[in-house]
Amino acid sequence: MTKGTPSQGKHNKGSNHIVCRRCGRRSFHVRKKVCAACGFGKSSKIKRFAWQWKKVTGKGNRVK
């Protein structure tokens, strides 16, 4: 077997993320046991931030 750059291409097998049980997205990190999308495994609350939605404008109509 050779070493060097040609061998590095053989390291792309397997996957770091699998389908999350809570949100259903392919964001659950296998080794960390944490979902990158919803925070499952780290927090009991769904991960969310204020910058995910546009700011409230006018009479309080939230625009997505």
From Swiss-Prot:
InterPro entries: Ribosomal_eL37, Ribosomal_eL37/eL43, Ribosomal_eL37_CS, Ribosomal_zn-bd. A zinc finger (C4-type) spans 20-38. Zn(2+) binds at residues 20, 23, 35, 38. Keywords: Metal-binding, Ribonucleoprotein, Ribosomal protein, RNA-binding, rRNA-binding, Zinc, Zinc-finger. Binds 1 zinc ion per subunit. One of its GO terms (molecular function) is rRNA binding. It comes from the Archaea. HAMAP family: Ribosomal_eL37. Binds to the 23S rRNA. Belongs to the eukaryotic ribosomal protein eL37 family. This is Large ribosomal subunit protein eL37. It comes from Methanococcus maripaludis (strain C5 / ATCC BAA-1333). The gene is rpl37e.
